[in-house]
Design a protein with these regions (language model features):
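Conserved GNAT acetyl-CoA-binding A-motif
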Residues: 113-125
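Acetyl-CoA-dependent GNAT
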Residues: 39-95, 106-107, 166-167
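Conserved GNAT-fold acetyl-CoA-binding loop/helix
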Residues: 21-48
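A short beta-loop-alpha structural element at the N-terminal edge
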Residues: 8-20
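Conserved acetyl-CoA-binding loop-helix of GNAT-fold acetyltransferases
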Residues: 98-111, 131-138
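Acidic/histidine-enriched, glycine/proline-rich intrinsically disordered or flexible terminal extensions
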Residues: 169-203
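Glycine-rich acetyl-CoA-binding "A-motif" of GNAT/NAT acetyltransferases
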Residues: 66-70, 131, 157
Length: 203
């Protein structure tokens, strides 16, 4: 397998909303990866993308003009003291697994979050999900606990494991996180995209 697959990681755009909604829908309808019950349509997905991108990155991996996966960061908790921590989420199209797309998207996302000044990334995984747990471990996440029977879906109660990854040193008096739009077009972000895309395997 070669690394030159001709794909790219970039900032999500309005035109990506239908593809992103399509990637996300099976996580709702076909299992318990997501605790949502009704898949959002493209319009609702666009609303979410726009809202997230006011502060955080929302990225996609595109190959042959087709979006195969996406990743984004979001607020971990609304209380002010949490503002240096984020939740991170990634979804890959069902036929594009095992190519390293999720890891590449996370790699790009983490570089940008560091540039913004964030210190900790958190991720929740509905259990059991061996593939997701292993991927997060490979990306440097450590398990910090399990919420038992915290979600009820499809007639069953489900556990959620929580994982954290340090992004940067937890210094005293940290500067305020930089909003993503202030960094989106910089050479540092473009370089992060290129480096991460080089990790993806061909089919």
């Amino acid at each position: 397998m070669t690394r030159d697959v001709g794909g790219l990681i970039r900032v999500a755009e309005e035109r990506d909303a239908p593809a992103i909604a399509g990637i996300y829908a099976p996580a709702i309808t076909d299992g318990v990866i997501s605790f949502e019950l009704t898949p959002p349509d493209a319009q609702e997905m666009l609303r979410r993308i726009v809202a997230i991108q006011q502060q955080y990155p929302w990225l996609v991996y595109e190959e042959s003009e087709t979006v195969l996966g996406y990743v984004y960061a979001s607020v971990h908790n609304e209380r002010a003291a949490y503002r240096w921590s984020v939740d991170v989420t990634a979804y890959i199209r069902h036929d594009a697994h095992r190519r390293g797309i999720g890891r590449a998207l996370y790699t790009a996302l983490f570089e940008i979050l560091v540039l913004q000044g964030y210190r900790t990334a958190c991720a929740g995984v509905t259990l059991p999900n061996t593939a997701s747990v292993q991927m997060h471990a490979a990306m440097g996440f450590k398990e910090v606990g399990v919420y038992h029977d915290v979600g009820y879906k499809f007639g069953k109660w489900h556990d959620v494991g929580w994982y954290e990854r340090s992004l940067a040193a937890h210094v005293l008096e940290p500067p305020e996180p930089v909003p993503f739009p202030e960094l989106a077009g910089t050479t540092h972000v473009k370089a992060a995209f290129a480096r991460a895309a080089g990790l993806i395997k061909s089919t």
